[in-house]
Amino acid sequence: MSSGHFFQWHLCDVFKSAMCCVSCTHTLSLLLCVLTLTSAATGAGPETLCGAELVDTLQFVCGERGFYFSKPTGYGPSSRRSHNRGIVDECCFQSCELRRLEMYCAPVKSGKAARSVRAQRHTDMPRTPKVSTAVQSVDRGTERRTAQHPDKTKPKKEVHQKNSSRGNTGGRNYRM
């Protein structure tokens, strides 16, 4: 083996070890950076959702179903929580997970009720018989009386639908 070949092989080995050192140094610095960012993120503490941010997140999670501010009956063991707690108590004063937010979504409507009127063909709609104007005025009076005196014996649940007046979120990310 000539000295030229020996020098060429030796130089190649030097470059390989130099590349290995650079690669190891680069990997080590990248690892330190990731560890620093991870510990800073976990040290920031739990994230809470309050006010408009809570409402926006609930609208995002629940979608068209809507949501309740107080938990509907039948969710979770009642012995663990007091009965007057709601989503604000659970997510504004302490951090809450996605599962907790989903508990406040309104139930999914049945397939027939959720079907859009626009999706129906116009021939699917039954024709209503014409009614005389005298009967219509009596019906409207009954409707007014019913609206003025709602049945107070039935419990009412207030479902909050998506509020389109809040504006477009513009692709805003939601924190959980």
From Swiss-Prot:
GO terms for molecular function: growth factor activity; hormone activity; insulin-like growth factor receptor binding. Residues 45-73 are annotated as: B. SMART domains: IlGF. GO terms for cellular component: extracellular space. Residues 86-106 are annotated as: A. Residues 115-176 form a propeptide. SUPFAM superfamilies: Insulin-like. PROSITE patterns: INSULIN. Residues 140-161 have a biased composition (Basic and acidic residues). GO terms for biological process: cell population proliferation; hyperosmotic salinity response; insulin-like growth factor receptor signaling pathway; negative regulation of apoptotic process; negative regulation of release of cytochrome c from mitochondria; positive regulation of cartilage development; positive regulation of cell population proliferation; positive regulation of phosphatidylinositol 3-kinase/protein kinase B signal transduction. Residues 115-176 are annotated as: Disordered. It is found in: Secreted. Residues 74-85 are annotated as: C. InterPro entries: IGF-I (IPR022341), Insulin-like (IPR016179), Insulin-like_growth_factor (IPR022350), Insulin-like_sf (IPR036438), Insulin_CS (IPR022353), Insulin_family (IPR022352). PANTHER family: INSULIN-LIKE GROWTH FACTOR 1, INSULIN-LIKE GROWTH FACTOR I. The insulin-like growth factors, isolated from plasma, are structurally and functionally related to insulin but have a much higher growth-promoting activity. Acts as a ligand for IGF1R. Binds to the alpha subunit of IGF1R, leading to the activation of the intrinsic tyrosine kinase activity which autophosphorylates tyrosine residues in the beta subunit thus initiatiating a cascade of down-stream signaling events leading to activation of the PI3K-AKT/PKB and the Ras-MAPK pathways. Binds to integrins. This is Insulin-like growth factor 1. The lineage of its organism: Eukaryota, Metazoa, Chordata, Craniata, Vertebrata.
